[in-house]
Amino acid sequence: MTINRLLAFSLLLVATLHCSFVHAGEGAFGWIYTLDLQPKGKVEFEQRLQLNQQQAAGTYDALTARTELEYGLTNDLQVAGYINSYYTSANQNYTNPEACGDSPTCTGGYGVPSSHDPSTAYKKSGIEGGSLEAIYRITNPVTSPVGVGLYLEPTWGRNKDELEARLLLQSNFIDDRLILAGNVVVANERLKFIENGNVPESMLDFLVGASYRFAPKWSAGVEARFHNDYSELNLRNQVQRATFIGPNMHYAAKDWWVTGAWRYQLAGGTCMGGGEAECSNARVWDSHSVNEFIVKVGFPLN
């Protein structure tokens, strides 16, 4: 599967399903989960495309596609299932001597196997795997000063298995036109594409953002990610720290919605604890990049 086929398949799914949709959902942020859940018995289709682009040098393009169905089990409990696919293209994108040795550049990064010749380009695409998701809303931001929810997502994939949990926080202001939201994200992972195919990692992220509805159907805002990576499970031995920030834009029509967002990695990221090979130019690499773009489209099915 090439990147063009991946995009074409996603667009075909969106176009085909759009013909039968008669209502609209909301997803105002790019990466932050909110507490706007599907009501009991409602189903929504969502397609996400994320592109991570540009590392220390050369070229690095990592596209991930997530095709999702969400279902409201109750008014406060939503479940979902994903099919995940990917496209990775890397060529001389690393510059750190700990990764490249005597060569000024080499090919590396998330998805590039340890067995790959770092002097040559790498390109691969395919179905990554699947995910399940559950969100439980404890308090509703529409009726309470602060909305609180819990999120759990196991993922099984070709490149990694992961168990991710989130604490979801949200407050609405100015007749719900202004949304402030935050996620505390904790994840344990096992990477399959490097070393023996069973490499543990963990992650702690803080996501914060704001979105303001400035016109009918239109919202815009900003979101930030404060990222921490660890080389062992359960947040032991920190190896990365980085900060990302950027704008988002959201449009909601009667029978569909779309959100686009961009995050830029600020200079000042650091690597430590044996993870120094993943850093250069005051930024962290691995699965990260200078620019991260995301587009999400949603259509309720009933």
Sequence positions of predicted segments:
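Transmembrane beta-barrel domains of Gram-negative outer membranes and organellar outer membranes
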Residues: H23-L207, S211-N302
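Bacterial N-terminal signal peptides that target proteins for export
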Residues: M1-F9
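Bacterial N-terminal signal peptides
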Residues: A8-H18
